[in-house]
Amino acid sequence: MEEYKVYLELDRSRQQDFLYPFIFQESIYGLVYGHDLNGSILVENVDYDNKSSLLIVKRLITRMYQQNHLIVSANDFNKNQQFWGYNKNLYSQIISEAFAIVVEIPFYSQLRSSLEGLEGAEVIKSYNKLRSIHAIFPFFEDKFTYLNYVSDVQIPYPIHLEILVQILRYWVKDPPLFHLLRSFLYQYCNWNSFINPKKSISSFSKSNPRFFFFLYNFYVCEYESIFLFLRKKSSHLRLTSFSVLFERIYFYAKIEHLVEVFPKDFLSTLSLFKDPLIHYLRYQGKSILASKNAPLLMNKWKYYLISLWQCYFNVWSQPGTIYINQLSDHSFHFFWGGYFSNVRLNLSVVRSQMLENSFLIEIVMKKLDTIVPILPIIRSLAKAKFCNVLGHPISKPVWADLSDFGIIDRFLRIRRNISHYYNGSSKKKSLYRIKYILRLSCIKTLVRKHKSTVRAFLKRLGSEELLKEFFTEEEDILSLIFPRASSTLQRLYGGRIWYLDIIFSNDLVNHS
């Protein structure tokens, strides 16, 4: 047990001290509202109406230096609309964003030290691959075809705020910094109860996205570090429940008989007690556990997770919320990056004939296949006003004020991302229907802008090469560029291709 404690404390030994003075540095606020770090592909940039100017920041820092008591109670936050004599919401938001930058410093230094041994090009290549929303499918294809059971786990939240602060204190020892953290949490949440996900977390994440994502990612990182430690130790610990008893009974009296008769049975018996490798994958607020053997071990790990959440994080979770399914009988659904996905293992039979009059050999192979969820995609298109609930294309009035190139570019980007994301599916009939809806919706939007008819616009479309190129299928463009290899390209395009260039969220979510 002492060895395990040392292992758990090893990564926390390099604790960072005295981060609180960074709050008073003007350069930190320049990083917060600078062009480089403010832009994010996941969080929409917040318009502060130039309220975070350097002059206001300098006045805020001066005010903080002159303030004697930095700890503000929850009643003061609720009663007063002025924060240290100024607008509470504005300055609290500015300081919380700077706080997120400051607490990210020690974790960024650890990440940088872990990447020092790699080449720059290799780091960029691997980073772009991991950023891809599509990277989950090659993982499924490589690992899940050999597995039998999968469990989709919802990572429970919210966590009690005091527990979160105590966990953060393991990594950073700076009391003033945690007093400031409690002040922010007092402002947005009720300290004496659990967070209400529908109210407090929603308002907190919208007003302070960087701060919220740091706290949530830190909680997930702490949970995963303990879980992966337990998984690693369970696969390497010496298991003595049955083997020691077996050896004590038969070793002295029948050692020759044991070695000669039971070597294979003895090894197979030990393998039943040894935990196999559990595959773990996390995406957004969920995680996936997959195993090859019987569901008994999956049930064991399910109760491990529940005990970890309840005892260590004080988060209540019911065993019935974690389901264990057999991959051969169930399809696996998940929602990631704004895309609906449905993964299934199909059994394909390969028949081979040795000689003309000889016997046939049938080999059953597992093949990972993705199904295009046509109904959820049509609901998303209807919500974004590209079609009605029945899937009939309609115009997009909000985009009618844009230029022709801007309208076509937006429709093309949405269609290309959806096409690339679901191109790994073997059945593309539903995908062609989605392309048709977007293409006709784009035409109707342009017709609405120019106050014309669909027939007149299609005639114009045939005379303009620029518009014609935008409405040409990608496989048609490839066949025009490489006419001799058109048949090969058609087979390639009809196959299963995983694109690793999808790093942005679904445009249906962003532009709805």
UniProtKB/Swiss-Prot annotation:
Q: Does the keyword Membrane apply?
A: no
> One MF term in GO for this entry?
RNA binding
- A matching Pfam family: MatK_N
Print the keywords alphabetically: Chloroplast, mRNA processing, Plastid, RNA-binding, tRNA processing
Would the keyword tRNA processing be found if you checked this record's keyword annotation? yes
Family statement = Belongs to the intron maturase 2 family. MatK subfamily.
Question: By what name is this protein known?
Answer: Maturase K
Q: Which gene encodes it?
A: matK
